[in-house]
Amino acid sequence: MFKSITFMSAILMATSAFAVDSPITGNVSSKCSIFTDKAGVYGNPSPDELSTLAADGGVLPIIRYDVSIADYYTAKISWPNSFSSSPTLTDSIAWDGEVSVSSTSDAGMAGYEAAKVEYDNHTEYDLTVAGSTWFTVESEAVYGQDKSLPGGEYVANIVAECIAD
């Protein structure tokens, strides 16, 4: 009897199965990168207005998109519609803005501006050609009903996204 128990134990140990989890990993690096090539600056052309236009004393920000694979990404750029920091404001701000293609690295990108889609404070471009595209972003903020803006620093942010198609 003892021999048969030992024999059965040896057989069971020889036929035991062991499970192993073996992971498969991978890293994906984006083929679309976004850079601020020039930081924007608000000019103050009148007591109730801030503007990035050069004629108003401002500096237009320039955002660059670098795409290494065509037809896989959409650029979504949103001009500001609020201040991320400012002095205390007691009235509303009327926001306006515009996003435009200012330069491209490839002649095949010439149609980007005509094909852009605009809604609310957002502008989208289908990035159909690999290379670099530079966008300028106009921003204007008008305070209240003929009220002067309080003195201090005003900061507003452009949101630039690369959306995978």
PLM feature spans:
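N-terminal small/polar-rich segments of proteins
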Residues: 18-94, 124-165
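Substrate-binding/catalytic groove segments of enzymes
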Residues: 85, 101-111
